[in-house]
Structures are given as structure tokens and as C-alpha cells.
Amino acid sequence: MYDSEVIEYAKEQENIISKLEYRVYKHDDGRSVNRQDLMRDYARVLYSSSFRRLQGKMQLLGVDASKFNRNRLTHSLEVAQIARSIAYDLELNHTVVAETASLAHDIGNPPFGHYGEVVLNDLSLACGGYEGNAQAFRILRTLEKKHYAYPGLNLNVRTLMAITKYFFNKHQNNKKFLYDADYEFLKTELDSKGVTVTKSIDAEIMDLADEIAYAAHDLEDALSFGMISLGEIVHEFSISDKFKDAYPTMTDIAKEAQNVAMKASRSGTSEEYAIVLKKELTSMIVNILCSDIGLVDGCLGYKRHAKLAEGLKKLLFKAILRKKDIQLYERRGEQIIRGLFEVYSDEKYNKDNMLLPPELRAINDCKTRLVTDYISGMMDSYAAQEYEKYFGKGSADKLYFK
């Protein structure tokens, strides 16, 4: 699928980071004979409790969790599949690393979506703030437990590098960063091996796969639940100064998907037509964007359709955020997160961190950081249940807060 130039680039980059294929803690569990070491990292992430909890974090805000829709877990599985295909077509030796990074890329996301991240960052500024990608790194390196002999999952450094989208500390970039301890850890490991790359080929692939899955599959869910129509998203492109260059392409995709849906032999009803239309849309978007990957400004990118990919993500997000239900959902989420933070941060009420799980109490860190760890790992529904436990039954369902 890809030209020789980008394949050669990918192989060169993989060769550079092959120096990072080692674990910091040497430990032989006697159960991994004849297993590829990087494949073990995939299993460790897949079977982690943090990954399982993604099933309770909605990919699209305001969607009832009981409905048949995507959540952060199913989204991560879809990102992993796309990443595997890209890595395979780029002829990487170890495609599983990009796949593992894709499984883990949302593992640090808090309840109640992006706005939950904003609220938690505001509450935890005293101990270095909060950022979803930084939290993912902390979870894998410190919080998750695999064995008593070491903290975290003891993943290969190459795998940890693969989930690092932004290699900055908070002083270098206060929007996208790693926590200071994790930044220093990774910097030390890279320096010790003479690796100067700050974003690995695995991370590049994961990042593109995430954007492609977001563009295609979130659109499908938004259409399925009536949050937006196909005409509306096409119109958003037409009126956007930043993304209007992609309007002709988006129009062509919409028309072609409609033509295919009209011709489908099973489309005897409008409901069947809508199903075929959505599936054709997602397939076309994924195929167009995956096929468009090449070498752009010295790294992986889209040769022609960057505005389409970014526009689908940002314009959909913008359109959905205008909905009243989404505004209420975010406001409710903020109240729950702030309430729980107040409870767990109370030195008298939560003396010796007894309200936190035992595995967090055992970590020697500031109270604010541990409270942030706990809340950020909660599923949306569990956070609401915990809030009601402390503030009274039905309190989480209030829709107006001062």
C-alpha cells in the first residue's frame, strides 16, 4: 500500500528504537518460555484492570451506557486493529508494539471525557496537574500491578516510548506533557542508549490510527444516535475557514456512500438504508485516510487528506458540544469530580487515605496526586455512585448547580 520512501523511513526508525527493547526490572517468572517479549507487553495491558475500566468511559459524551454504542474500550480495540494494519504495511518487524500502544492510549482518560480532564487538571495543579497521556504513562509504569517485585507492569521501554505522544515535562509544555518523574525516567533511559528520537515510529502509527478511528467511528455513533446528520457534518466543512478545503472530498464521500446504500439489495426500508450508509461511510473514511499515509515533513502524516482527518474530529466534536444534553452531562460530571475530590482531600474525613484503595495507600506520594489517581481511574457510573454515597441518593442526578 505504501511507497518505498515511507517504508524505508519506518524501518530506519524501528532500528533506532530497537535499542529500547528491554525491561528496567529483570524478573523471570518462569512462564514465558518461547514467547516474544514484546507480545507479553500486549497481554499485560490487555489484562490490566485499567484497560477493563475503559468499558465504563464513554467515547461520545451524553450517550446512555446501556445503549449499543462504542466506549473507550471498544474504541481502543478499533485503534489497535488499524495500527496493526498500518504497521504491517510499513513492514515493521514488531507490529505488536503499535498495537499495544493503541490499547493503552486512552487508559489514562478520566470519567466524563475531555472536560473531566480539564477539571482534574485544575484541581491538581498543586502537585503538577493532570493530563490524560501523562496519566497513562504513570498507570503503566507505577500504578498497575503485575508482580510484587516491581511497580507497574514493567513493560519494555520501547512499549512505554510507544505511548508517549508528547515528550515534554510540564515546564516545557503545560498543555501536553509527562509528569516530572516519568519524564526524567524516560529521558534517562533514552540517554543511556543514545536514542535522540522523541516520538517513536510506534507512537506515530498509534497517533494516526487513533485519529482515523475517531474520524470514522465516532461519526458512525453520532449518526446512529441522532446527535448529528450527515448533511450537518458536510455543512460544517463548507462553513469552516480552516477545513473548507476538505469540503469537496467530504461531499464526494457522502455522495458515494449514499449511492452504495441506494443500490444495496437489502435496503428495503429506510432503516436498512441508514445502516448501509453508515457502514459505507466508515469504511470509505478509514480506507481513504489509511491509504493516504506517507512521509510528510520528515515523519508520518497524510499526503492529501490531513484537513479531512482533523476536520472530521474537530467539527464533529464542536457540533456535538453545542447540544444541550452534552452541556448538562459535562456540568454534572464537573460537579461529581469536584465533590469527590473535596471528600477524598479532606485530611480529617479521609485520614491516612483510608477512603482510597489499598494499592494507592501503599504508594508514597502526595495526597492530591493519589486522589487524582483514584478519581481519574473511575468509570462514569462508579463516580456517580461514589458521589451519591457521600452527598445523598439522587444528588448525582441534579442538573443545576451554582
UniProtKB/Swiss-Prot annotation:
Q: Which UniProt keywords apply?
A: Hydrolase
Q: Which CDD domains match?
A: HDc
Any Pfam family the entry gives: HD_assoc
Kindly list the biological process annotations in GO that this record carries.
Answer: dGTP catabolic process
Keyword rRNA-binding carried by entry: no
**GO MF term list:** dGTPase activity
Family label: Belongs to the dGTPase family. Type 2 subfamily.
Its recorded name reads: Deoxyguanosinetriphosphate triphosphohydrolase-like protein 2
